[in-house]
Amino acid sequence: MRCYFYAQKPGAPDTPGDGTVSFCLPELNISFRARYRGTSAACEYAALLALLEFVDINPKMFEGKTLEVFGDSFAVVNQVNDRLYCRKELQPLRSMAVGYRNKIPFILNWVPTAENPAQGAEL
């Protein structure tokens, strides 16, 4: 089952501010969107973590399915996949995502923003 996460925060990437996090599961017609305060990278991690928490608390919806998670954050995808350095301040968020991987088997891949349906997730 394909799942997508997305985050957007206006302004300078390393300056905390109000952003939007979202995820969607097109096959189940589920979308989620919420506000989150943090840097751009923290917002991107928050979107991934919100999706993984949803999967974790709804195991019957995903029973017997291969979970493919897609995000347009090159950094988050590659940090969680151990292919890119993760800054110290983001390591707790990365650790949470890796912790979910130990509970929920999922594949994490990058997708171009234009192909990410989570960017248009409805409230």
Question: Which stretches of residues belong to each language-model region?
Answer:
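RNase H-like nuclease fold core
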Residues: 1-42, 46, 53-54
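RNase H catalytic domain
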Residues: 8-14, 49-123
